[in-house]
């Protein structure tokens, strides 16, 4: 696969984006922030709920239904503003995060990973859109694979390995074709 224009590297104790230190020459309240990778946890960019009993909880007020592609569309549309405000990175997760905060019970099924460890194509298409836009903006996303409350949906150690290998493969497991 072709290399992405935005490359992340570590040089001693600082992050580099495309060969340049992040926040070059900048300070905050007298502290050097050059080389840091400021990020925000935005785990729900590829979110969907496969549980019919809980899916309606996330419906949009204007349509009365949940739409995972709209969720990703809105996420992608907001990214330039985040970048303009100085955010260089965000954390996204293939199993999302708890949509209600730190819930004890998580009946929803938000996993982009099937029980056998294969990566769900619809989640990967949404992730590809986010990663492509991040690349265009010169951002370096952090992609998480598992999330507590959803990790039990992956069957066994072999499935865990399959998910990790798929996510860490060429282009982060993101398919080169079939993007929207």
PLM region spans:
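Basic/polar N-terminal segments that are highly enriched at the extreme N-terminus
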Residues: 1-5
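Active-site-adjacent substrate/metal-binding segments within catalytic domains
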Residues: 6-140
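Active-site groove signature of glycoside hydrolases
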Residues: 95-96, 137-153, 157-180
């Amino acid at each position: 696969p072709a290399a992405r224009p935005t490359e992340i590297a570590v040089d001693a104790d600082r992050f580099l984006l495309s060969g340049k230190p992040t926040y070059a020459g900048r300070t905050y309240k007298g502290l050097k922030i050059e080389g840091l990778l400021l990020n925000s946890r935005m785990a729900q960019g590829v979110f969907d709920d496969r549980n019919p009993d809980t899916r309606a909880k996330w419906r949009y007020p204007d349509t009365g239904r949940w739409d995972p592609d709209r969720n990703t569309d809105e996420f992608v549309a907001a990214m330039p503003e985040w970048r303009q405000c100085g955010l260089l990175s965000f954390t996204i997760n293939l199993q999302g995060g708890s949509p209600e905060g730190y819930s004890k019970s998580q009946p929803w099924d938000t996993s982009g990973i099937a029980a056998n460890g294969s990566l769900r194509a619809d989640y990967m298409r949404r992730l590809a859109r986010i990663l492509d836009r991040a690349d265009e903006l010169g951002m370096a996303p952090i992609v998480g694979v598992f999330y507590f409350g959803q990790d039990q949906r992956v069957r066994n150690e072999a499935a865990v390995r399959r998910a990790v290998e798929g996510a860490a493969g060429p282009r982060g497991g993101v398919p080169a074709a079939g993007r929207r």
